[in-house]
C-alpha cells in the first residue's frame, strides 16, 4: 500500500478555493502532468511563493473550508502530480474531499485545537500517517500523535489507490 505523509507545507488561511489551487485558465491542459507548474499560482498568502515553498512537500496543513468553489477534479490532480498526497484541515468542501478519496489521496479533518497544535510545531514538520490505525504522527519542535476519523468506504478507496482501482478490484 502507498505511504502517506511527508514534509508539511502550512497554508494559514480559511476558504482556499479551487481557483487558487489551480487557476481555471489551465483546465484545458491535456495531461495531469501539464498542470504541475501552476499549483497554487493564484494563492495570495503573505510571503508565499509556490515555486519555492512547495518543493519537497508531501502534506498540506491548512484551516477551514479547504477546496471550496468549483468542483473541479483538477484541484486534486495538481496535488497528485506535485507529490502532495495528504491535506489536513479543519474542514473541506464536500466535493473536494470526495475527489481526494476518489483519487487515492487523504483529506484528513481535525478539530481546530489539533490544527492549532500542528501549526504550533514550527516550520519544519514531518507527518507520517498510519491509515490502518487512523493516526498521524507529526514531528517538529516536539512529537505529537493525533487520531482522525475516516469512514470504512473512503478508507477502502484510498487503500485501493482511488475509485478506478477500487472498482477494478471489487466489481
Spans of model-derived segments:
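Conserved phosphate/anionic-ligand binding catalytic regions in large, soluble enzymes, centered on
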Residues: 16, 67-73, 159-167
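Acidic, glycine-rich flexible loop/linker segments
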Residues: 104-171
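Feature captures the catalytic cores and cofactor-binding loops of soluble hydro-lyases/lyases
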Residues: 3, 22, 28-133
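Alpha-helical scaffold segments in soluble metabolic enzymes
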Residues: 20, 38, 99, 156, ...
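N-terminal, positively charged, Ser/Thr/Ala/Gly-biased leader segments
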Residues: 1-24, 165-170
Amino acid at each position: 500500500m502507498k505511504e502517506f505523509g511527508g514534509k508539511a507545507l502550512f497554508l494559514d488561511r480559511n476558504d482556499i478555493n479551487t481557483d487558487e489551487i489551480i487557476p481555471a485558465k489551465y483546465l484545458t491542459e491535456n495531461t495531469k502532468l501539464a498542470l504541475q507548474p501552476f499549483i497554487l499560482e493564484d494563492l495570495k498568502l503573505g510571503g508565499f511563493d509556490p515555486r519555492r515553498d512547495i518543493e519537497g512537500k508531501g502534506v498540506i496543513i491548512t484551516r477551514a473550508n479547504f477546496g471550496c468553489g468549483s468542483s473541479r477534479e483538477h484541484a486534486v490532480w495538481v496535488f497528485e502530480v506535485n507529490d502532495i498526497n495528504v491535506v489536513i484541515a479543519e474542514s473541506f468542501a464536500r466535493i473536494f474531499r470526495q475527489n481526494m478519496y476518489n483519487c487515492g489521496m487523504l483529506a484528513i479533518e481535525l478539530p481546530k485545537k489539533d490544527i492549532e497544535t500542528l501549526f504550533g510545531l514550527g516550520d519544519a514538520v514531518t507527518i507520517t500517517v498510519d491509515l490502518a490505525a487512523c493516526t498521524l504522527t507529526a514531528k517538529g519542535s516536539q512529537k505529537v500523535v493525533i487520531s482522525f476519523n475516516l469512514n470504512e468506504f473512503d478508507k477502502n478507496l484510498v487503500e485501493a489507490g482511488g475509485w478506478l482501482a477500487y472498482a477494478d478490484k471489487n466489481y
